[in-house]
Amino acid sequence: MESPLVLALDTDDLEQALAWSRAAGKAAGMVKAGLELVGAAGPAAVAALAGDGRRVMLDLKLHDIPATVAGGMRAAARAGAELVTVHALGGPAMLEAAVQAAGDRCRVAAVTILTSAGPEDLAAVGLPPAAEAVPRLAALAVRSGCRAIVCSPLEVAALRAQLGPEVELICPGVRPAGWGGSPPGGNDQARVATPAAAMVAGATRIVVGRPITRSDDVGAAARAVRDEALAAGPPGGGEDPANHPKPADAHGRFDAL
């Protein structure tokens, strides 16, 4: 069974990102490139990771008019991204445009509510609590054609019951048991859980970055997270993450590791 771990490559240094990816090896089923890396290295970051045999989640959280988001999706697919995030708050027309532009080249993952958002943050922008907003946004995204949802591990059990086994549920805000680290200025994740708890609740994939990339041994830390997740049981709905289609030109560099 493929690892459910998505390794977050939170750096502006492409060589560092590649080094982390290679150190994690097969312990990470995918890697995530976000604004920090792509802002510094551009689409070449995705192309380099995909060319290294990696399945790439491009975490741009697109939220714009439908035509602009569609153009962004086409560019992401050309670069080699397999999953691309958009904000479900963009609404049905934007989500449908993203799905249509992605076609069969990549998948659209709709972000519900950021894991950094607490009740006060949501109230400040006029949104209901996450327990109410997340199921509504997830249902909207699925109706619009999205087959992957990004949500906090605290909401994944309710979404798994609501959406069934076919929808891929991807959980950031995952912290290994006992990890006490935080970024400068404090912890920026408000709704978190352990890898085991996220998997038991029904997650398909878990996104983990700093607890692995800040460790002294990236490979060992990645394997520990993967093992903790898989020991809790199979990914949500009992489906192997590898069953989701890979890009046609993936090189499979890590299959032999």
What name fits each language-model region?
Residues 2, 64-148, 152-157, 162-170, ...:
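Conserved anion-binding
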Residues 7, 31, 61, 84, ...:
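Conserved, mostly hydrophobic/aromatic
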Residues 12-23, 67-74, 130-138, 189-197:
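Short, acidic/polar
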Residues 23-24, 49, 76, 98, ...:
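Generic structural signal for hydrophobic
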Residues 26, 52, 79, 144, ...:
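Structural motif
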Residues 83-91, 189-221:
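Glycine-rich phosphate-binding active-site loops on the catalytic face of alpha/beta enzymes
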Residues 95-99, 212-236, 254:
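C-terminal helical cap(s) of enzyme catalytic domains, especially alpha/beta-barrels
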Residues 242-252:
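Short, low-complexity, charge-dense intrinsically disordered segments
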